[in-house]
Amino acid sequence: NTFLTCGIKYTQHDSKESIARKCFELIELGVDSIHTNSWNVNFIKYISEFNIPLQGHVGFVPMKSTWTGGVKPVGKTLKEAIKVYEDIIELENIGCWAVDVECIPADILAEISKITKMLTISIGSGSKSDVQFLFAEDILGYHNDSSKTPRHAKKYRNFDKIYQDIQKERIKAFKKYQTDVEFKKFPSKKHSVLADQKELMKFKKLITDWNNGNK
């Protein structure tokens, strides 16, 4: 009963027809919805005509961060907040069923969530949304360097340390294996299979005869 949404990089497609074919391929594979991320709005309109469920994205877009003044929240000024609102309404009018709202002020999203009919999915935009989202990398703590963890994220485990410990154990294991091989501790009898002695004697005699030219 898992609802699966899959993202497509529209930059890898040079036409609406190309991206439509990719959408249909994913739907045939069992995907329930297509995540449009930072698609061109004309692409989104075109795909919506095929009644494919679409999930939009507004607010901070990492690949467009230079357009919004760098890696920082979007929507803190009236002008930016209005743009976020207009983008959401446009996606709603196109027919999107949900929208990611990334890194906008929590109180701005709270007001927008009261108005839009779409499900709002908060990514660092406060608790007044229908759904909360965090990347697994942030939840699991893949980055030991706290400067790489976004302000809005919370680390529930330190997988970076776990992976470092695993790597240390890998190195220890390979070194121990190397030492055992060098000092003939591996393989031992329990790691090997021996032939029946009678069969072994027959084999040794046979190859001796062969080597002596008595085939």
Give the residues covered by each predicted segment.
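Alpha/beta enzyme core
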Residues: 1-215
